[in-house]
Every structure is written in structure tokens, then in C-alpha cells.
From Swiss-Prot:
It comes from the Bacteria. This is Acetyl-coenzyme A carboxylase carboxyl transferase subunit alpha. Acetyl-CoA carboxylase is a heterohexamer composed of biotin carboxyl carrier protein (AccB), biotin carboxylase (AccC) and two subunits each of ACCase subunit alpha (AccA) and ACCase subunit beta (AccD). Its main location: cytoplasm. GO terms for cellular component: acetyl-CoA carboxylase complex. It is an enzyme of class 2 (transferase).
Length: 317
């Protein structure tokens, strides 16, 4: 699907010219000199654009429709994927995918939010907003992983938990709270990666980990910029102003010193521009952190998780 953001438009137009020149170039008509000139210009422009993004532009990138989702990472990072469906209580939730796979031969559990790219898939995936049955399915898979001694990898990319009446009636708050409690006590390594939007409790319900990683152009916040603007100024259009105040980018979160452990670099132009390259960076980081955790005892893993949560409550005067 061809989609680009407003600030990407000059780069997209330049790349379209390059594509046309390559198509027209033949043995009789040589455009190689012009092509090389435009390639250098495009590379320079790409660096200028993506090295000077403001917080609102990063938020837009985090929501990019072509950004890799959980199943894209499953395809490029893991092997032998086997998806698990249903919470054994109500129904399956396509907004949260869960299953088992291998990371470089190591069996593991994989859990993550899943959005859609076209209208039909977006509706099917509920725009990446899980119902309580999604969180209960995730907990079911985490408990299975614990039973078999498998590490757990979770991928966070959601605007938040679904706030519908049915979701509330089926215990949305209870499902999130239970996941927070149970994840803190798991006896196996848990590695969390915020890949796109890390939206409030809907993100936290699968984000209590020994390691929390964040992709370079992801965001992590208690509320969306538009939601914050609507509350503070009664105007959702002031989202860009709210984004600056929320300090929700990977760099901002890393500066807090206790929420995330590493920022995963993305290809120049964003993860949506090259899924394979983005996934390879994720794979390298996951493997590195798993190697750091694999020899820890269950008590050490739980204590580490506990201390990580405690550090977030420290107040600087």
C-alpha cells in the first residue's frame, strides 16, 4: 500500500523521479549521471528529514500504516511459528496474536498487538485495541511458556485497550490488572519491545518485563497526544502541542533512566521503509538480552522485575 506522511512528501516525489529515470534509461539513452545525482540528493534529504523529527512527527511514524506489526516480526525474526487462539472462556481476539516459535533455534512464546493495513483488516484487528479476552489469551500463553520453561517475547503496538461497553462488561480492567500481577511473578525471562504505539494500560498489560526495549521511532505514553489535548484544551487538534509536553519518544523515555533498557535503531527513513532491516536490528537486540537473562534463576528474574518496577516509583526532589 502506497502511503506517506506530509513531511515525507519531498522525499517521495524525488524517489518517484528516480524510478521514472530508471525506467526510461536504455542503452540508447543513458541517464546514469542524472540518476547518481538524484540518488545522492535523496540520501541527503532523507538524512535531513529523519534526523530532525519533532515529537508529533515521531508519533505519526509510530502509527504509520506500513510500519512492521507483530506478524511481520514473526516472519522475519522467528521460525516455526505456531499461533494459539482463544482464551478458553469467551472467544479469540485478533487484536492480540499469541503463539510459540523459535529464536535462533531457542523455543519461545511470542505475544503482540496486531493492527491492520487496509480497512477490512483494521476492522478485523479492531485497530490493534484488545478486548479482555485478548489479554486473557496472552496470559494463557504466558502461563504455558512458564510451565515449559520458555522465554517470552512481547511486542507492544496499540493505541490502548478497547473501551467498548462489551469489553468493560467482560472485565477489561480486571484482565489488565491480572496480567500486570501475573507477569511480575513469571519464572521465565520476559523481554518486551515497544514497536509502535505504547498506549497506556493496553500496552502495560503485556509489557511487564525483565527487559523493555523501544524502537527508535516508537512512542510510549499514558495517553495519546489527541486525548491529552482534548482533556487539557478541549481541542484534539492541539495534539502536536500535547506531544511535545508528553515527551513520549524513545529518546525521552530513555532519559527517564528506569523505564526502558535500550533503544533499537531503525533503518534511515523509518522501519516502514525496510521491514527486513528493522527486524534484523530487533533480532540482534532480542538475542543479546536473552543471552544476558538465560542463566538467571527464577527468583533472580522475579526480583529483577520487581526492582525495575520499584525504580519507577522513585521521586527526585
Amino acid at each position: 500500500m502506497q502511503f506517506y506522511l506530509d513531511f515525507e512528501k519531498p522525499l517521495v516525489e524525488l524517489e518517484q523521479k528516480l524510478s521514472e529515470l530508471r525506467d526510461y534509461s536504455t542503452d540508447e539513452v543513458d541517464f546514469s549521471g542524472e540518476i547518481q545525482r538524484l540518488e545522492k540528493k535523496a540520501e541527503k534529504l532523507r538524512r535531513e528529514i529523519f534526523s530532525n523529527l519533532n515529537r508529533w512527527q515521531v508519533t505519526q511514524l509510530a502509527r504509520h500504516v506500513n510500519r512492521p506489526f507483530t506478524l511481520d516480526f514473526v516472519e522475519h525474526v522467528f521460525t516455526d511459528w505456531f499461533e494459539v487462539h482463544g482464551d478458553r472462556n469467551f472467544r479469540d481476539d485478533p487484536a492480540l496474536v499469541c503463539g510459540f516459535a523459535r529464536l535462533d533455534g531457542q523455543p519461545c512464546a511470542v505475544i503482540g498487538h496486531q493492527k491492520g493495513r487496509d480497512t477490512k483488516e483494521k476492522v478485523y484487528r479492531n485497530f490493534g485495541m484488545p478486548n479482555p479476552e485478548g489479554y486473557r489469551k496472552a496470559l494463557r500463553v504466558m502461563q504455558m511458556a512458564e510451565q515449559f520453561g520458555l522465554p517470552i517475547f512481547t511486542f507492544v503496538d496499540t493505541p490502548g485497550a478497547f473501551p467498548g461497553i462489551g469489553a468493560e462488561e467482560r472485565g477489561q480492567a480486571e484482565a489488565i490488572a491480572r496480567n500486570l500481577r501475573e507477569m511480575a511473578a513469571l519464572k521465565v525471562p520476559v523481554i518486551v519491545t515497544v514497536t509502535g504505539e505504547g498506549g497506556s494500560g493496553g500496552a502495560l498489560a503485556v509489557a511487564v518485563g525483565n527487559r523493555v526495549l523501544m524502537m527508535e521511532n516508537a512512542v510510549y505514553s499514558v495517553i495519546s497526544p489527541e486525548g491529552c489535548a482534548a482533556i487539557l484544551w478541549k481541542d484534539g487538534a492541539k495534539g502536536p502541542v500535547a506531544a511535545e509536553a508528553l515527551k513520549l519518544t524513545a529518546g525521552d523515555i530513555q532519559n527517564l533512566g528506569c523505564v526502558i533498557d535500550e533503544v533499537i535503531p531503525e533503518p534511515l527513513g523509518g522501519a516502514h521503509s525496510d521491514h527486513k532491516a528493522a527486524a534484523e536490528q530487533v533480532r540482534i537486540c532480542l538475542k543479546k538480552h536473552l543471552d544476558d537473562l538465560k542463566d538467571l534463576s527464577s527468583d533472580e528474574l522475579r526480583e529483577q522485575r520487581y526492582q525495575k518496577l520499584r525504580a519507577m516509583t522513585m521521586v527526585q526532589e
